[in-house]
């Protein structure tokens, strides 16, 4: 079980919170998280790259020059892969890049990644509840009050982000906002710091704490 300090919106300490999740063994943790990240990145690929072979290129019914008498190598079509405008040899075709990974492994990788970053977790009480209108400056000032550098990559995890907070965060280049049910290994490992609301922490414990 790990304990986190809870801060209020002004950055002052307001209590403690705990998180208890089962994680992978040290000997397999890195490999497990690596496979989870590879799977996530592979699933984000569209796989729509496509080229034409010499059989599919339009035209190509005539020879570029006569068979004999030129001193050059013989060629039978203007759509050979050796000529500009010709087909592509072994070019890409639409395909799926999806990688298989068991559900238990995926959930274990997620729990392991989160617990590996527990020292970088900052829990905030009533995150952004005082905002009445979207205001980017309020979010950036709050992150500074929490001790985060202005150029730090921050992942904010909320239970159900409001539209006001979404619009306040979207103009901050280094800050990413996700809901607790959008938790993923890549974002957890990519960020320098993780900012969670109390509700998001409780939801994560509820969803992943029973495994």
Swiss-Prot record:
Top-rank lineage group of the source organism: Bacteria
Gene Ontology biological process: translation
GO CC, alphabetical: ribonucleoprotein complex; ribosome
Disordered: annotated segments: 41-78
One family name in Pfam for this protein: Ribosomal_L4
UniProt GO molecular function: rRNA binding; structural constituent of ribosome
UniProt keyword list: Ribonucleoprotein, Ribosomal protein, RNA-binding, rRNA-binding
InterPro entries (alphabetical): Ribosomal_uL4, Ribosomal_uL4-like, Ribosomal_uL4_dom_sf
Bias type Polar residues, positions: 41-53
Bias-annotated ranges (Basic residues): 60-71
PANTHER family reported in the protein's UniProt record: 50S RIBOSOMAL PROTEIN L4, LARGE RIBOSOMAL SUBUNIT PROTEIN UL4C
Similarity comment: Belongs to the universal ribosomal protein uL4 family.
Subunit organization: Part of the 50S ribosomal subunit.
Purpose of the protein: One of the primary rRNA binding proteins, this protein initially binds near the 5'-end of the 23S rRNA. It is important during the early stages of 50S assembly. It makes multiple contacts with different domains of the 23S rRNA in the assembled 50S subunit and ribosome. Forms part of the polypeptide exit tunnel.
Name of protein: Large ribosomal subunit protein uL4
UniProt lineage: Bacteria, Bacillati, Cyanobacteriota, Cyanophyceae, Synechococcales
